[in-house]
Amino acid sequence: MDHLPIFCQLRDRDCLIVGGGDVAERKARLLLEAGARLTVNALTFIPQFTVWANEGMLTLVEGPFDETLLDSCWLAIAATDDDTVNQRVSDAAESRRIFCNVVDAPKAASFIMPSIIDRSPLMVAVSSGGTSPVLARLLREKLESLLPQHLGQVARYAGQLRARVKKQFATMGERRRFWEKFFVNDRLAQSLANADEKAVNATTERLFSEPLDHRGEVVLVGAGPGDAGLLTLKGLQQIQQADIVVYDRLVSDDIMNLVRRDADRVFVGKRAGYHCVPQEEINQILLREAQKGKRVVRLKGGDPFIFGRGGEELETLCHAGIPFSVVPGITAASGCSAYSGIPLTHRDYAQSVRLVTGHLKTGGELDWENLAAEKQTLVFYMGLNQAATIQEKLIAFGMQADMPVALVENGTSVKQRVVHGVLTQLGELAQQVESPALIIVGRVVGLRDKLNWFSNYYD
């Protein structure tokens, strides 16, 4: 993060703008809306500045840049069409430890101005860090269309109720549950928009009188294979409403950055053959936190019901009578194959797909005869340590030695790497790859060179 997003309280505080043209006028309008006590210093001014000055809204200082005007300032903006003057303003502000924005020169500035969606008191700011103002503007326009105009009225009314909510609901969890009901109540929002005081009061009293659900719950959420863009909308909603998130090592940092900031986080990372936290202990963590009345999200890489042991965790909750739900995720087989240019099915090469675990319980054995059959694609999860055995068994049960294979490491992420070859090389190829990785076996792998669209490394 190159810039810390903050909201400044500028009401009745001295601010300076250097420049008297159209750009300076736009910046002045923002500072005036924020209640700043504004001085504008320039050689000449467009008419709007004179109008504001005559109305007593700001002070004009005509002439060259006077750095003594900064002495009482909290914040400054350099908005002239002269780069040399703008740099002088920036240097003078820097020497006084005053934050200064330099229009169209983010590297010379100590702060940048975001694109703003104003639903006061709700404010949304969008910034590209000065690298792409057009992108920030396009995002602002999209958000403008998504956020109702009356949202500010809802936020303002919520502020009026805060003391009552704090008095009536003793815990943070209860208050959060109340506010979640409050902000999704369409009737209340519409009544506020219509200025229907009677309906607003009736809906408010109903919200306060309805009992809150104090029962805890567990939501099993599939985080997908790595790319945060592959997290489902419902999954995103759940991690942003969680009291506590229990997650494993296959959940990417980008996805964890989307988790509600105030949520507790419990890492229970596991590797094939080694459990940082035993599965039974994970089950008990989910049970214990839900019994405290918390909204628990169990966040798993891929899909929780495909080699994620999600069923085992839910059985424990079911036995204890804890409410639960499941949000599916994109499983690694689907995500990694797509990002590697390998279709899992193809009319000419594969009429079926088998998802296989390469990490068996002691003494376990796969149905190698059926796995070696023609016209199918095999995807092995957690198979790196068994790659040589997979190679040996498939060949022994009749699979052709030149069957294409691929190993996908860190699939769908910026660190994705794919190595490929033929079945007789599988054990050797596995030595070049680190976990997490997926093994794909089948004629469809041969299409990779043609269909590969996502590549960060040359294989």
From Swiss-Prot:
Q: Which reaction does it catalyse?
A: uroporphyrinogen III + 2 S-adenosyl-L-methionine = precorrin-2 + 2 S-adenosyl-L-homocysteine + H(+); precorrin-2 + NAD(+) = sirohydrochlorin + NADH + 2 H(+); siroheme + 2 H(+) = sirohydrochlorin + Fe(2+)
Q: Does the keyword Phosphoprotein apply?
A: yes
Pathway the protein takes part in: Cofactor biosynthesis; adenosylcobalamin biosynthesis; precorrin-2 from uroporphyrinogen III: step 1/1; Cofactor biosynthesis; adenosylcobalamin biosynthesis; sirohydrochlorin from precorrin-2: step 1/1; Porphyrin-containing compound metabolism; siroheme biosynthesis; precorrin-2 from uroporphyrinogen III: step 1/1; Porphyrin-containing compound metabolism; siroheme biosynthesis; siroheme from sirohydrochlorin: step 1/1
Report residue spans for region: Uroporphyrinogen-III C-methyltransferase. Answer: 216-459
Name listed for the protein in its UniProt record:
Siroheme synthase
Which Pfam families does the entry link to? CysG_dimeriser, NAD_binding_7, Sirohm_synth_M, TP_methylase
Give an example GO biological process. cobalamin biosynthetic process
Q: Which PANTHER family match?
A: SIROHEME SYNTHASE, SIROHEME SYNTHASE-RELATED
- For this protein, the Enzyme Commission number is 2.1.1.107, 1.3.1.76, 4.99.1.4
Similarity comment text for this entry:
In the N-terminal section; belongs to the precorrin-2 dehydrogenase / sirohydrochlorin ferrochelatase family.
Q: Supply the alphabetized keyword list.
A: Cobalamin biosynthesis, Lyase, Methyltransferase, Multifunctional enzyme, NAD, Oxidoreductase, Phosphoprotein, Porphyrin biosynthesis, S-adenosyl-L-methionine, Transferase
From the UniProt record, report the name of the gene that encodes this protein.
Answer: cysG
Q: Which residues bind S-adenosyl-L-methionine?
A: 225, 301-303, 306, 331-332, 382, 411
Look up and give the organism this protein is from. Salmonella agona (strain SL483)
List positions binding NAD(+): 22-23, 43-44
Can you tell me which residues form the catalytic site? Answer: 248, 270
According to its UniProt entry, what is the function of this protein? Then it catalyzes the NAD-dependent ring dehydrogenation of precorrin-2 to yield sirohydrochlorin. Finally, it catalyzes the ferrochelation of sirohydrochlorin to yield siroheme.
Q: Which residues carry this modification: Phosphoserine?
A: 128
Segment Precorrin-2 dehydrogenase /sirohydrochlorin ferrochelatase: which positions? Answer: 1-204
Among SUPFAM superfamilies, the record links this protein to: NAD(P)-binding Rossmann-fold domains, Siroheme synthase middle domains-like, Tetrapyrrole methylase
What one GO molecular function would you report for this record? uroporphyrin-III C-methyltransferase activity
